[in-house]
């Protein structure tokens, strides 16, 4: 049991280190877009983008804490969406449908953003029609369910399974597998990610976590 516990601590440390990495591609592309806006005298949008980038990194760092409030996690997701909507010239819309009673509960930071990133890069990027991303948050008994839904190109069942099993080695951020691993390590096998997708219809990612009151996060 001691060896098993040490392995869990080691894996948690590895996942924290991955989480702390700044995605250089995303940062470069965002700064490039801000520079272009400034050159076009579009200072209003440039200021909004800089503000979103600052908030994104402030929440990402969050004093080195692993857990943040769901409210902050959603602000992190929204900051990412603001940046990408400018970069993608409004090729997609996004909306939040959130049960406000869950906002004060705690969750692992940077849980939602990797799935939004996946939706944009793999689901919406090559679409002809306007893309749509919905983030839905609900209570479900003793748990909280976060849904990231898109109307993108979709995937086969095999591709869904591959995403959940494949480690990310291209330094473009936290992989879906890492998020799933993290949730299972912290909370057990009943928690984590499920992906449902249909080609040319879209993808729905469901993230299941326990309800954690502020102060209880130290128990994990």
What does each model-found stretch correspond to?
Residues 1-196, 202-208:
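Two-component histidine phosphotransfer core
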Residues 191-194, 215-220:
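Compact Cys/His-rich metal-coordination microdomains
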């Amino acid at each position: 049991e001691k060896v098993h516990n040490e392995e869990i601590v080691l894996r948690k440390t590895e996942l924290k280190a991955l989480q702390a990495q700044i995605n250089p591609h995303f940062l470069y592309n965002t700064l490039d877009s801000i520079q272009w806006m400034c050159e076009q005298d579009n200072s209003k949008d440039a200021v909004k983008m800089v503000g979103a980038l600052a908030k994104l990194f402030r929440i990402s760092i969050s004093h080195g804490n692993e857990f943040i409030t769901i409210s902050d996690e959603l602000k992190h997701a929204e900051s990412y969406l603001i940046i990408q909507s400018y970069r993608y010239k409004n090729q997609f819309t996004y909306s939040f449908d959130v049960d406000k009673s869950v906002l004060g509960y705690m969750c692992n930071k940077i849980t939602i953003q990797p799935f939004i990133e996946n939706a944009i890069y793999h689901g919406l990027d090559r679409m002809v029609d306007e893309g749509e991303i919905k983030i839905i948050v609900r209570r479900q008994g003793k748990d909280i369910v976060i849904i990231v839904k898109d109307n993108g190109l979709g995937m086969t069942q095999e591709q869904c399974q591959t995403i959940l099993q494949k480690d990310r080695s291209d330094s473009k951020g936290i992989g879906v597998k890492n998020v799933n691993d993290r949730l299972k390590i912290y909370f057990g096998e009943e928690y984590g990610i499920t992906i449902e997708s249909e080609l040319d219809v879209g993808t729905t990612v469901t993230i299941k976590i326990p309800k954690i009151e502020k102060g209880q996060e130290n128990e994990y």
